[in-house]
Amino acid sequence: MAVATHCFTSPCHDRIRFFSSDDGIGRLGITRKRINGTFLLKILPPIQSADLRTTGGRSSRPLSAFRSGFSKGIFDIVPLPSKNELKELTAPLLLKLVGVLACAFLIVPSADAVDALKTCACLLKGCRIELAKCIANPACAANVACLQTCNNRPDETECQIKCGDLFENSVVDEFNECAVSRKKCVPRKSDLGEFPAPDPSVLVQNFNISDFNGKWYITSGLNPTFDAFDCQLHEFHTEGDNKLVGNISWRIKTLDSGFFTRSAVQKFVQDPNQPGVLYNHDNEYLHYQDDWYILSSKIENKPEDYIFVYYRGRNDAWDGYGGAVVYTRSSVLPNSIIPELEKAAKSIGRDFSTFIRTDNTCGPEPALVERIEKTVEEGERIIVKEVEEIEEEVEKEVEKVGRTEMTLFQRLAEGFNELKQDEENFVRELSKEEMEFLDEIKMEASEVEKLFGKALPIRKVR
């Protein structure tokens, strides 16, 4: 069971595009044209996927669906300053420009215009340092770019969580802490009642918390977002009479058929009045709280031993996520206990046949050459055809540049001109930490142009 952290940041869509040259096709959906000495940037709508599962399977929408969205999308034109103009900017203004462009490239295209402007304003006002660090960090920038592929999908939340799974690191955590918890730039997802607290009568009436001691595998899970990862081996030990500590680990599959391992420590306290309820509260990161409900268990020191846990939780970004898992001593779900599990699942209105069996063979990662061959084989058939057709669409849209109405990105670009008049106030507002960060990164004008003139690589993070 993975830690639920829906936020600004758990695999990422395999057909994101970047532009690496002035007239090229890129994976982020950004094209650049130089007209009368000024760079114009076009933001293309993100390609969306109909299905994204933790098993690593991908099912993308057909090209015709993408082309339809392409032709109907709004193409926003942003005049960028020239290199000479950039060189005249001071470091504080460069930092603010980075923030504006980050919003334009990575946040605004994915959301409603009004909400996006509110989010950008919040980030630029309250999370300048964290935003700048995120854009300068490949994993964090790739994570935000990955999120754009989730926009308006039926499984938008699940897709966002999978992005976080792939690109999680300390910079992402710091950005989330500011944007989600401290400054609340992201609205909290409300509880839709999908995972209600179960009636106490369906829980085990007696449970010795020490029975959780030792190593357990998750061999079956309800929620594909949190529960169905490979190689879920969790080791528990008790502290005192009613405290349980779990060292949990799971594997995240990557797009090239590889994987890397995530781990976390979770601490639970047993409810003194309901032995079948365990609470994991008082966590700093996103202030998440998980409640575990034990539906059924059998402890006989045999391979068929199991503990069936249903859970629900909340954090600063999402109230009401949940799922259910079956812990077994065996790495494979024993068939002999399935009737008991079916009965327990039915008690909370769930069908156990919909649960997903996990793969706990925990084998080695495929050789790099095998992963590359598989990735190339799966992608080369799509790339040639789509590049040709997308280039044709791009050229048609470029002809419409002169007739483009004022858009959100034009307003952002106009805001850049105001930055030049606001330098004195901006410098006065900078904190000591922000000034130290500016000195630390020593971001030159050419580096800013390079950062936003080329693609942010979405790559496997080790």
Curated annotation (Swiss-Prot):
Xref: PROSITE patterns: LIPOCALIN (PS00213)
EC number of this enzyme: 1.23.5.1
InterPro entries for the chain: Calycin, Lipocalin_CS, VDE, VDE_dom
Protein's recorded name: Violaxanthin de-epoxidase, chloroplastic
Organism: Arabidopsis thaliana (Mouse-ear cress)
Region listing for Involved in the binding to the thylakoid membrane, in residue ranges: 380-391
One protein family per Pfam: VDE
GO CC terms of this entry: chloroplast; chloroplast thylakoid; chloroplast thylakoid membrane; cytosol; extracellular region; thylakoid lumen
Gene that this sequence comes from: VDE1
